Every structure is written in structure tokens, then in C-alpha cells.
Amino acid sequence: VVEAVTRLARLGGWRVGVGVGDVDRPLATHAREASGPAFFAARRAVEDARGAPGAVAVRGPADGRAVRRADAAVVLLASLLGRRSAAGWEATGLVDRGLTGAAAAGALGISPSAVSQRLRAAGAEEGARAAALATDLLGDADR
């Protein structure tokens, strides 16, 4: 889920609704045919994402404390990522794939200090921490 939110934040222009909870089985062939508390929550979340910070919302069958916390973490992550520049995405993408700052600098044709500046401006460390937090809190909300 966090990976999908990250990819859609990078693309921009999307409203993202995340539903937590159970789904009816067997799973439907098409999402429109699916049902269960998670699907109903996701549909509500997509509507709630309209005008929400980061254009994202997390909802559950009962929007209790765990769901509200997961929502807050995902909103913070999407808001941070939505402010990231193309240069920031480029630098974080290389480092996320395991390149060192020096190797990323070589790939980008810039200095290592310029890579460091891009990573700071992109909130790379904050984004990684927010993604980990969102993952944990979404897991808690889905229990």
C-alpha cells in the first residue's frame, strides 16, 4: 500500500483511498464487483481524499484510533512526497536502489555534495521514516 501511495504521489494528480478491513471471498474478478468492509471503506476513503492534504485518506469499517493513526501517517507521507522535485525523486531513486551518494553523483553528473543537498531538500530521510511508520500503522489498523 505504501509503495502504491509513493508511486501515485510521484505521478501526481491522483486521489488515493485506502480501505482496511476484511474482503468478501471468493475475490471478484473486477474491483467494481468486490465487496466487504475494506472495499466499502476504500470507496469512502477515495471520496474523503478529495481536498484532503496529500489527496489521500485511510478509512476502515470503524474509523477507530488505529485507522486515524494510519491515516495521519499516510497523509504526512503523501504530503511530503507531493512536495518533492523531479531532481529530488531522481536522487532518492538512485539511493533507494542502493547507490552510494558518490555513485549517485556519478550517475547524475553532479558532485556528491549536490546529491546530499538534493536528498535533504527531497526529505529523503523523513520520507523513509514516514513510509516505515505508515506501513506499521496500516498493519495495526488492519488487525
Language-model region placement:
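Regulatory and interdomain segments flanking nucleotide-handling catalytic cores
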Residues: 1-143
